[in-house]
């Protein structure tokens, strides 16, 4: 597994699932999880560790309103983290600070 994908809620799946086809097309292994940095932070942290043990090389955090999910991921790994803003909130401006 090369890419660990995190989404903050089920409503993010419709948007992020478009990336799955691209990853499949290039033969990139991935696993996605729907976990909230606000509601389930311990589960996010545990999943990061689990995915690194499975060989994750990069993480993607996609959530609406703010970049907290990507920030939590980045705080708990030395691997690259890509943050994807999904509307709402500050229009993704909080990602600039990561």
Task: Give residue spans per PLM region.
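Conserved small/polar residues in nucleotide/adenosyl-binding loops
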Residues: 96-98
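Short glycine/serine/threonine-rich phosphate/pyrophosphate-binding segments
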Residues: 12-16, 41-42, 63-72, 90-94
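Glycine-rich phosphate-binding loop
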Residues: 47-89
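N-terminal beta-loop-helix "entrance" segment that forms/cooperates
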Residues: 32-52
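Generic alpha-helix signal with a bias toward terminal, lower-confidence helices
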Residues: 18-19, 23, 42-47, 81, ...
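Glycine-rich phosphate/diphosphate-binding loop of Rossmann-like nucleotide-binding domains
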Residues: 1-31, 36-37
